[in-house]
């Protein structure tokens, strides 16, 4: 599902390329953490950002996935090449593997702080890079 699912499928099928060294960082969360948070949130209420305290880069996620799939780390293309491909994708429509919106999503970091959830709920996230398993 989503971008992570597409990354796994692409690496599995040998149709995945890193972009600009895959340096963008993302906040991630193990699904098991959601289950442990529900009772805490039901009791306390409020609005919280929940994610791992460490925000892995795409390259780190690629490495974890490749290790589990016994695949080589994907080749990384320069940003300008990906941008050209994205512009073509914009013209091709929804079936294109990449377009300008997708390029922006995978090359820009998007991270959040979980400090409030940890402090107010006494919650501790599971380390994603150490515990992620492809099922």
Predicted regions and their residues:
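Mid/C-terminal beta-alpha module of Rossmann-like enzyme folds, strongest
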Residues: 40-98, 133-135
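Hydrophobic alpha-helical segments typical of transmembrane helices
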Residues: 3-6, 84, 102, 113
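A short C-terminal helix-loop "cap" of Rossmann-like NAD(P)-dependent dehydrogenase/epimerase domains
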Residues: 8-19, 94-96
């Amino acid at each position: 599902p989503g971008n992570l699912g597409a990354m796994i499928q692409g690496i599995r099928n040998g149709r995945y390329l890193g972009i600009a060294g895959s340096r963008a960082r993302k906040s991630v969360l193990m699904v098991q953490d959601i289950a442990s948070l529900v009772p805490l949130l039901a009791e306390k209420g409020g609005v919280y950002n929940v994610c791992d305290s460490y925000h892995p880069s795409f390259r780190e996620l690629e490495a974890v996935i490749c290790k589990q799939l016994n695949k080589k780390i994907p080749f990384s293309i320069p940003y300008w090449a990906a941008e050209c491909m994205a512009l073509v994708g914009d013209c091709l429509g929804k079936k294109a593997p990449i377009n300008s919106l997708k390029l922006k999503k995978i090359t820009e970091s998007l991270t959040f702080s979980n400090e409030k959830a940890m402090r107010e709920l006494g919650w501790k996230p599971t380390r994603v890079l150490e515990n992620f398993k492809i099922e």
